[in-house]
């Protein structure tokens, strides 16, 4: 009975691993044109991957983008009055820290309260910004709004 094959005994089959042919190293071994054929751009240099063979390139066919990206754009996290009703139905004072602990917003980012939904709880809320409808609904429910910077 022969011994089992072990990992360190494995070798590639004879002729399976051929050395890479080094071209352009003399006339006898793929010298001169080195497998590139004769003449033309591809024989002389590397053609750019973006080259489309004389067709108008894609970056020139597409329209230019208008406008710019405003570096001073402020993106607000949104909280609706329906969320306030759901999480703070007893009313009271609500700050951004309370909204963070309730899982409605993330810390260190501005918060805007919008007027989607209904609110009956009397909340005194402090946030970065309020929409006009949110202010109206909160004040109609007996609460107050305070805008921070």
From Swiss-Prot:
Alphabetically ordered keywords of this record: Ribonucleoprotein, Ribosomal protein, RNA-binding, rRNA-binding
InterPro entries to which the protein is assigned, alphabetical: Ribosomal_uL15, Ribosomal_uL15/eL18, Ribosomal_uL15/eL18_sf, Ribosomal_uL15_bac-type, Ribosomal_uL15_CS
Family of this protein: Belongs to the universal ribosomal protein uL15 family.
Compositional bias segments (type: Basic and acidic residues): 1-12
SUPFAM superfamilies noted in UniProt: Ribosomal proteins L15p and L18e
GO cellular component terms attached to this protein's record: cytosolic large ribosomal subunit
One Gene Ontology MF term: structural constituent of ribosome
Physiological role: Binds to the 23S rRNA.
Region of interest (Disordered), ranges: 1-55
Subunit: Part of the 50S ribosomal subunit.
Name assigned to this protein: Large ribosomal subunit protein uL15
Highest taxon of source: Bacteria
GO biological process, one term: translation
